[in-house]
Amino acid sequence: MDLRSYDIICFGDEVPGVLAVISAAREYRRRTKLYPRVLLMSKGSLQEGIGGHLVRGGLAYLDRSQVSQELQQSLNLDPFGSPPTIYKEFLQKSGVSAIALEPSKATAALKAMLVQAGVALLSKVEIKSINKEGQKITSIITSKGTVYVAKQFIDATVNGELAQAAGVRKLNGFETFGLPNSELPVTLSFETQGLSVRRLKELDYIYLKRFTNRADSEAQKFLLSAAGKDAKLAEELRLEMIDTRGNLKTLWAGKDYIDVRSPALSVAYHSFRGRKLSFPETGIILDEGNIAILPDERLSWNALLFAVTSSEAEALARNGSKPTANMQKEISFVTTWLKSLGATSVTPASELYIRHAGNVTGVVEPLTGAQMLRGGVPATEALATFSYHFDVRGGISGIGEKAKSRGWFKSLMFQQPTFNIGIRHALMKTVPNLAVVSPCSGFEGLACSVGRIVEFNVAVGQGVGIAAVNAILNNKNLADISNREVRQVLVETGQLPKIFGVANNTDGMLLAQFETLISADAIASL
């Protein structure tokens, strides 16, 4: 039998998982002066790039922690707060100035950090089965028949694939709200060359000016076509192009990113495509884009969304996040359109950005949206602080109807949380030597809409890496390790970022009411 033995194995090469094993390897070496045996295995082709959806999925526009002006001033913070130290290092080594991450630089930075930490890599892995001793995982058997033994395991996949193989029960889609088929859309990112920021600004402005000018009959025909001949929708789209002061909602270009603020470019594409600009009806949309500005007149677009059910999201994740034929067909139309506007090339990513694919159950301490609004874990336990809105891009299908049916007629928009991070929602109680560090961790209610963000999960991953070493050196399981133990290491090594969680108890109570009310029937069916 081909048997390989390690201390820690991570399945999945999403950035939080990669930084978790680097964190673990460094901590083990600090404590023992020896290199640990750590293995990072992935379904993906690591030769194509290391870093999951940020690299092979081409998601160059990073979602950063968003700290309010008030907190920035009172606590002397920068706009992105105080990121986890290992994330800061990764961004610095990848040459990120604010938002834009060059995939080739990211993979080079991660590879160098992995080599330096002595982490082994394994590509294109399929799990055949899992061996367990009692509740604990003892080894992973791959489809090639090799047995990989370890003491502690980390699952960094969007769908909790290792956890599922180990018998962990997963809530599909938004089953936490009794909506097991509903899922967030997936994105096929693409990169354009030859379309300058200046040219894109001009196009955006021209489209805005024309679509909002009712006397421009040709432009109004295009607008009506994009609205699927629905005059009411055409009017709504027109109104979305103007702000409250009556000014055109032109795109915003920062140093290394562009935020498209109106549907003008989307209208232009959808009229060209002959498809109604209505995501709930068609399931495909060129949305208002988040665009990263890369060197050599390259732009990386997070804009093309595809609706998926929870079972489709799961199937895509299991299939290595590869785009479907239908998605490839759509990108060919996007390519034709963008080339007509001046792009010299349009290159789609080799993998999809899957935002969410369910959540595991049976963690040590589940994390809800209400807990985030209340400020997260106590400051004395905190490993970092994160601030981000409850972002369900593309919407959760059926949530409005579900809320009304349960008697909730208040707003579904909740305040942005600024909360302290721990690791206990990522540690499995049911499989005590396993942690799930991804959008699939033990989130309940609205928590996954914030908890799916990479920067947040890196803080969790750094903590889990340290926890895994604590567990190994003290002959314990991951599930036994407290936030305080991990925090102690961060303090000792000068790695603890600023902690500034905000307890918003009023909004926290409101969201707790909503989460409890909407999830009541979901919990009853478990």
Listing of model-derived features with the role each one plays in the protein:
Residues 7-9, 39, 435:
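Conserved beta-strand elements of the Class I
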Residues 15-21, 51, 114, 126-128, ...:
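Mobile, glycine-rich extracellular loop/lid and propeptide segments
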Residues 29-129, 180, 184-186:
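Conserved N-terminal/central alpha/beta ligand/cofactor-binding core
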Residues 14-15, 100-105, 455, 480:
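Soluble non-cytosolic domains of exported or imported proteins
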Residues 131-147:
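Conserved beta-strand-loop-beta-strand element in the redox core of flavoprotein oxidoreductases
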Residues 20-36, 152:
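A short, Lys/Arg-enriched amphipathic alpha-helix followed by its capping loop at the start of a domain
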Residues 53, 146, 150, 157-463, ...:
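Flavin (FAD/FMN)-binding glycine-rich loop and adjacent Rossmann-like elements that form
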Residues 2-16:
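Beta1/beta-strand and adjacent pyrophosphate-binding region of the FAD-binding site
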